[in-house]
C-alpha cells in the first residue's frame, strides 16, 4: 500500500522516475480496482520518453492495464517498449531478449482463456528468456478472481478432459518463466 501512496505523491510532483520506480517495485500488487482510474492516468500522462526509460515498469503497467480492461493503453505501452528495444543499442542482446520474452508473457493475457493460444506466447517467451519474469510476483494471485483454475479455462461443454490435458501440456512453459507462479 505504501507504493500506491508514494505513486500518488510522485504523480502530483511530476516525478515520473519516482512513480515508475514505485510501480516497478510494487509489481502491481497494491493496485486494485479502487485505484484503476488513477493508475490509468499515471500511465496515460507519463511522458513516453520517461516510460521508455523503465521497461520493467512498463511491463507491470501493461499487465495491470490488462486486468483493468484498458487494452488500448496497454497496447500503447507495448508500442513504446518495442520501439525502445528496436532503437536502443545500449541494451545487450540478452537483455533485449529477456524483455521481448517478458513482453510475450504479458501479451499472452490477451489470449485469455484459450490456454493453447496463451501457451504459444509462453513458449516463445521461454525461448527468449534466461531469467524469470520480473513483472509478475510468484506469490501474487493467479486466478483473476475465479474460484478455480478449471473454471478459468473451461470453455466448451463436454471438453473438460481435453482442456485438462491441454493445461498439463501447456502450463510447464508458463511456470518456467514465472518462477512457478500458480503451480499450487
Predicted regions and their residues:
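Extended alpha-helical scaffolding segments used for macromolecular assembly and cargo binding
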Residues: 1-68, 73, 77-80
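Internal alpha-solenoid helical repeat scaffolds
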Residues: 49-184
Amino acid at each position: 500500500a505504501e507504493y500506491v501512496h508514494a505513486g500518488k505523491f510522485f504523480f502530483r510532483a511530476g516525478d515520473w522516475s519516482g512513480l515508475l520506480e514505485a510501480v516497478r517495485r510494487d509489481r502491481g500488487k497494491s493496485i486494485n480496482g479502487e485505484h484503476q482510474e488513477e493508475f490509468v492516468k499515471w500511465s496515460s500522462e507519463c511522458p513516453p520518453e520517461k516510460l521508455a526509460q523503465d521497461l520493467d515498469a512498463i511491463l507491470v503497467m501493461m499487465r495491470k492495464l490488462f486486468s483493468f480492461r484498458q487494452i488500448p493503453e496497454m497496447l500503447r505501452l507495448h508500442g513504446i517498449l518495442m520501439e525502445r528495444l528496436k532503437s536502443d543499442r545500449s541494451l545487450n542482446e540478452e537483455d533485449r531478449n529477456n524483455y521481448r520474452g517478458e513482453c510475450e508473457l504479458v501479451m499472452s493475457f490477451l489470449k485469455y482463456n484459450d490456454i493453447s493460444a496463451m501457451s504459444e506466447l509462453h513458449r516463445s517467451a521461454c525461448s527468449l528468456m534466461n531469467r524469470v519474469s520480473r513483472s509478475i510476483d510468484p506469490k501474487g494471485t493467479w486466478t483473476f478472481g475465479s474460484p478455480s483454475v478449471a473454471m478459468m479455462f473451461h470453455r466448451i461443454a463436454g471438453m473438460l478432459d481435453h482442456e485438462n490435458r491441454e493445461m498439463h501440456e501447456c502450463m510447464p512453459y508458463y511456470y518456467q518463466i514465472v518462477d512457478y507462479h500458480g503451480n499450487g
